[in-house]
């Protein structure tokens, strides 16, 4: 979604990696 894109762009790759890890843990990705 655009929110994930915006968050990744604004917060940086660290936030994106954290979000991806969170999704992977919950199996949502």
Swiss-Prot record:
Disulfide feature: none
Record protein name field: Galanin
Organism: Amia calva (Bowfin)
Chief place where the protein resides: secreted
Annotated positions of the Alanine amide modification: 29
InterPro entries, alphabetized: Galanin (IPR008174), Galanin_pre (IPR008175)
Role according to the record: Contracts smooth muscle of the gastrointestinal and genitourinary tract, regulates growth hormone release, modulates insulin release, and may be involved in the control of adrenal secretion.
Family per record: Belongs to the galanin family.
PANTHER family from the UniProt entry: GALANIN (PTHR16839), GALANIN PEPTIDES (PTHR16839:SF1)
GO BP term, example: neuropeptide signaling pathway
Molecular function in Gene Ontology: galanin receptor binding; neuropeptide hormone activity
Places the protein is found: Secreted
GO cellular component, one term: extracellular space
One Pfam family hit: Galanin
Record key words, sorted: Amidation, Hormone, Neuropeptide, Secreted
PROSITE patterns cross-referenced by the UniProt entry: GALANIN (PS00861)
